[in-house]
């Protein structure tokens, strides 16, 4: 039996990955992390989507310690989300160590349930500049987990080389475009669906959706070519 664990936030990217995983694996578990993020609604959204899609199990883990250590606009209500980069070249929404912790815990969970695949929706094409969304980081984490647990494990990143328009096309491939558009929470200001339309996350999401809806055939063709050439 093929089992997978999906790192699941209830946002556009992880929901698209979850929809795909449910088609490709016999048993799918979702894992969501409560790290004291700005909007607790994220967790409620993730729980509802996971239930509606019928995952085998949905685990919500309390990792509040991350909030104490990582100062970010996503972990502090008094820090407004900014479109400007900080002096270190990163947006102030970057939560240092977040994906290191998430992938480690997802790997441990996969070990316990006998799953050999962890799926995450990180992306290096259209992304916010987070270093822990890059392909070389994920590969390094994969190596560390395999060596540290002495067990075969693959971290799968279906969106790594897709732009946002192609990510929308992927959701549409699985007849889930409206599900993703209407029910996910990607907005940094905590508005479900199309969001506030003003934060960096909403800007990226809307630009990708507009590009896909205005050029469906071309974007879908590009997606299929990447799937065939890169095994996405």
Curated annotation (Swiss-Prot):
Superkingdom, taxonomy of origin: Bacteria
Instruction: Name the cofactor(s) required for activity, per the record.
Output: Zn(2+)
Identify the metabolic or biological route this protein is part of: Purine metabolism; 7-cyano-7-deazaguanine biosynthesis
Cross-referenced Pfam families: QueC (PF06508)
Q: What is its EC number?
A: 6.3.4.20
**Which EC class does it fall in?**
ligase
Record-level Gene Ontology MF annotations: ATP binding; ligase activity, forming carbon-nitrogen bonds; zinc ion binding
Q: Which HAMAP family match?
A: QueC (MF_01633)
Q: What does this protein do?
A: Catalyzes the ATP-dependent conversion of 7-carboxy-7-deazaguanine (CDG) to 7-cyano-7-deazaguanine (preQ(0)).
Q: What is this protein called?
A: 7-cyano-7-deazaguanine synthase
The organism is Vibrio parahaemolyticus serotype O3:K6 (strain RIMD 2210633)
What lineage does the source organism belong to? Bacteria, Pseudomonadati, Pseudomonadota, Gammaproteobacteria, Vibrionales
């Amino acid at each position: 039996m093929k089992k997978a664990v999906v790192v699941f936030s209830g946002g556009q990217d992880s929901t698209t990955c979850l929809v795909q995983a449910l088609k490709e694996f016999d048993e799918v578990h979702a894992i969501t992390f409560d790290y004291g993020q700005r909007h607790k609604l994220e967790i409620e959204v993730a729980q509802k989507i996971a239930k509606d899609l019928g995952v085998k199990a949905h685990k919500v883990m309390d990792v509040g310690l991350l909030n104490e250590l990582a100062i970010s606009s996503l972990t502090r209500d008094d820090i407004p989300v900014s479109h400007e980069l900080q002096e270190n070249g990163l947006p102030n929404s970057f939560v240092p160590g977040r994906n290191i912790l998430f992938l480690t815990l997802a790997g441990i969970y996969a070990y316990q349930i006998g799953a050999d695949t962890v799926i995450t929706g990180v992306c290096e094409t259209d992304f916010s500049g987070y270093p822990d969304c890059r392909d070389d980081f994920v590969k390094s984490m994969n190596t560390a987990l395999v060596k540290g647990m002495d067990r075969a494990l693959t971290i799968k990143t279906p969106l790594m080389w897709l732009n946002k328009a192609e990510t929308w096309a992927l959701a549409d491939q699985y007849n889930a475009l409206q599900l993703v558009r209407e029910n996910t929470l990607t907005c940094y200001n905590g508005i479900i669906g199309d969001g506030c339309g003003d934060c960096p996350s909403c800007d990226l999401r809307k630009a990708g959706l507009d590009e896909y809806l205005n050029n469906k055939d071309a974007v879908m063709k590009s997606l299929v070519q990447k799937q065939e050439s890169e095994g996405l």
